[in-house]
Curated annotation (Swiss-Prot):
InterPro entries: Baseplate_J-like, Phage_Baseplate_Assmbl_Protein. It comes from Bacillus subtilis (strain 168). Belongs to the Mu gp47/PBSX XkdT family. Pfam families: Baseplate_J. This is Phage-like element PBSX protein XkdT.
């Protein structure tokens, strides 16, 4: 808005207001006296532009976006801690609160028999399955302690884009009166949930089915499914949670659909077929994350585009999805999982 308020423009206006019989050339007393003020005014206009960016929700960032969201009763979701299963010596009672260590991470044993990472965020999602845990407490009879699979993934603090999207959903009243968007909002408020899909009247009048992924956009664990159920409808139809009286909610996990990709590729000079495969795998994985519960068709053209834009690819042909040169349609509850990627090197 104030892009034209430059140092030069401000100086020109100031000098034009000086009497014509006074020397205003660069280096003159008047010029040198006005120049510092003009420079500060130019900086002020730059700050005014910044302030305008920060006070409107579509461009606000950080704490300024937090303050706008708070006006609508929305808070930025804090980082959450990963919850994992553990395996311990049979017959040994592990006291609640016992601490364990592995790979620079500390875990606490909880009342429900799980391990919660003390470090918030995605750190606890690391590939630790099968690793031995070091007990930091003396526990009689404990000989083995092993960290197992992730039950509820940890996630980082909510980013600006996600918070802004939730803010707009609220102020535009897209999620109100227990409509589909409202159920989606409730489900995605639960720590550990990534995305939710809503199926109204799926089993008759008053029934709602919610299908969820975890924060990593993978199938949800039974513990996470129960958390969503307890938050929205702990006592079916009684209105004890977020859902209104009479609504009976069923919560289920999304289901993997394994997707295999094959292609014939000519690598760029000085690039190996392994580099090509790695780039294609990364591109497809990112694409699958974005499309989960947003689109249920994996289009051949989209895979073609990923291969075409891979830096190590010179040329390609015969791309297939699950053995066919056709689009792959997912069911309403399926999310794609990348299976085998078969890349055949073309000869020059």
């Amino acid at each position: 808005m104030f892009e034209d308020q430059t140092f030069e423009a401000i100086m020109e206006r100031m000098l034009n207001s000086i009497s014509a019989d006074i020397d205003t050339r660069e280096g003159s007393v008047i010029y040198n006296a006005l120049a510092p003020a003009a420079a500060e005014l130019a900086k002020s206009y730059i700050w005014l532009d910044t302030v305008l960016e920060l006070v409107f929700s579509d461009t606000a960032q950080g704490e300024f976006l937090d303050r706008r969201a708070a006006e609508a009763g929305i808070e930025r979701t804090a980082a959450t801690k990963a919850v994992r299963a553990g395996e311990f010596t049979s017959g040994v009672t592990i006291p609640v609160g016992s601490r364990f260590y592995v790979d620079n991470l500390y875990f606490q044993y909880t009342a429900d028999g799980t391990l919660i990472c003390e470090t918030p965020g995605e750190a606890g999602n690391a590939n630790l399955t099968g690793r031995n845990l070091l007990s930091l407490d003396t526990i009689p009879g404990l000989e083995t302690a092993i960290v197992k699979e992730i039950l509820i993934p940890g996630r980082e603090e909510e980013g600006d884009d996600s918070l802004r999207e939730r803010y707009f959903t609220r102020v535009r009243r897209e999620a109100v009166s227990a409509n589909k968007m409202h159920y989606k909002e409730w489900a995605e408020e639960v720590d550990g949930v990534g995305k939710a899909k809503i199926f109204p009247l799926w089993n008759g009048e008053g029934t709602v089915k919610i299908v969820v992924t975890n924060a990593n956009l993978e199938p949800a664990s039974p513990i996470l499914i129960q958390k969503v159920k307890d938050y929205i409808d702990p006592e079916p139809g009684q209105g004890e949670g977020q859902a209104p009286i009479g609504a009976v909610v069923t919560v289920e996990s999304a289901v993997w659909k394994e997707v295999e990709i094959s292609a014939e590729v000519l690598p760029e000079i000085n690039h190996s077929i392994d580099e090509v495969k790695s780039e294609i795998e990364e591109g497809v994985l990112n694409f699958f994350k974005k499309m989960a519960f947003e689109d249920n068709v994996i289009r051949l053209s989209q895979i073609n585009n990923i291969v075409y834009n891979s830096p190590s690819v010179s040329d390609y042909s015969n791309i297939q999805i699950n053995g066919t040169s056709e689009n792959l349609v997912l069911s309403d509850v399926e999310i794609p999982k990348l299976g085998q990627v078969k890349i055949i090197e073309q000869t020059r």
